Amino acid sequence: MYQHIPIEMKLLLTYSDIDPAAWQSLVEQSSYATWFQTSEAYQFYASNPKEMIPFAYGIERDGELRAVVVGYVTKEKSALKQFFTRRAIIIGGPLIGEHATESDVEQLLRVTASELKSQAIYIETRNFNDYSKWKGTFEKCGFNYIPHLNFHIDTTSVELAQSNIGKHRWKYIRLSIRDGATMVENPTIEQVEECYDLLVELYSTK
């Protein structure tokens, strides 16, 4: 009697191979999700070719997208400076789904490192969530897992917030307010898009 043993099928994907609907679904269900791991973030990086070289890799197992990495390689105007300072930045950390295994994440990190080794002198993943569960996996793939401290500013009063921000930065805030800047609570989608358009223009001209 023959016994049927299911075989897991894994696919390593680049940006053009990743199904947009599967990507969006992964963003919606992952506890590690941030805007910086979305296809929109990739498109934002791609819209600024003078400053960034975008990349995105994903791993699909048994027909399900399990994890994605999105980031960019820094780009300098000077070829010499570019050669010595080029680095790959993954803002927010990897996007990991609830069904992803250690093998999935390890393979994704190894492929990312392999694909970028000729483009960057090192890879920096700026994790916005608690990835301590995956610390061993990161280290197995050659990453140094370095804890960092978030800075918190007490905003219980305007005076206290101002003293914690610092005089120099507060000066720029006051100048912005003088020039017409305002605080918007619960911005609309249109306002958020307008903000990103301004960022694109800023990165393109500065």
Question: What does each of the following model-derived ranges do?
Answer:
Residues P54, I91, A120-Y122, H148-N150, ...:
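Extracellular structured ligand-interaction cores
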Residues G58, A67-V69, I121-N127, V184-N186:
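A structural signal for short, well-ordered beta-strand segments and their strand-loop junctions
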Residues L65, A88, Q119, N144-P147, ...:
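A short, structural micro-pattern
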